[in-house]
Amino acid sequence: MTLQLFHSTGLKLAATLVAGFISLNTPAAAKSNQTEESFSAEVTKMFAYKYLKYLPEGYDGKKKFPLLLFLHGAGERGDNLDLVTVHGPPKLIKKGKKFPFVVISPQCPRDSWWDAHALVGLLDSVIAMHAIDKSRIYCTGLSMGGFGTWELGSFYPERFAALAPICGIGRWPDSRDYTPFLMYKKPVWVFHGAKDSVVPLEESQRMVDALKRRGGKPKFTIYPEAGHDSWTKSYDNPKLYEWFLSHKTE
């Protein structure tokens, strides 16, 4: 399935920028060398996401189910959805595992990064077409998908009941356009390998520290002997999914 989304600030809208007018109190006889002008522009950007959809046993379109959004890493980008089944929940589903969630696993286009606003558009599309319990929407991702999880949790914390970024990079915690403190009240479970040479452990540590500085209580699991692949153990652990289901938005 393919989602096409036009957005500038996350939803389908056109941003109109109008230059403000500046007026100065000058003597009536004085001539001004400033003239009043205006500018307007329509800015749009298109995203097209293919995605895998898993419906749990018992789904009939009437009873509402929780939703798990899974974001893959950089190596699975492209236009072949088979790549998305290499890791994480899609891999487990392919092997026959049954989940109590609707699982949505989009594929990021080649040479692109996850965009939080486009992903929320995807979520809205899925919610509109399926019976989803909006109080139990969860997000997790690995590596580049861990970055996407941090992005979604920071820009749209109200949309998620819990988040689990795995070996992901977050933006600098104190930058003005990225505010992890918005998600400090959310349940967050972070995973990382101590010997990760691709995304250093410090990347997750500073995000965890940023949440704690603002009063958050994130869980942080460090695998002492793991390298970049800290996701296999994480996604194979039933406790992760039990933890997700134990949370819902108020």
Predicted regions and their residues:
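Primarily recognizes the serine-hydrolase "nucleophile elbow" in alpha/beta-hydrolase
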Residues: 129, 135-183
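C-terminal catalytic histidine-bearing segment of alpha/beta-hydrolase fold enzymes
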Residues: 188-191, 197-250
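The conserved beta1-alpha1 loop
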Residues: 71-72, 167, 192
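Active-site machinery of serine-nucleophile hydrolases
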Residues: 67, 71-120
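Gly/Ser-rich "nucleophile elbow"/oxyanion-hole loop immediately N-terminal to the catalytic nucleophile
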Residues: 58-63, 111-144, 157
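A domain-start/cap signature at the N-terminus of enzymes
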Residues: 25-67, 142-147, 152, 205-209, ...
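Bacterial N-terminal signal peptides that target proteins for export
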Residues: 1-14
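Alpha-helical scaffolding within the catalytic cores
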Residues: 81-94, 122, 169-181, 202
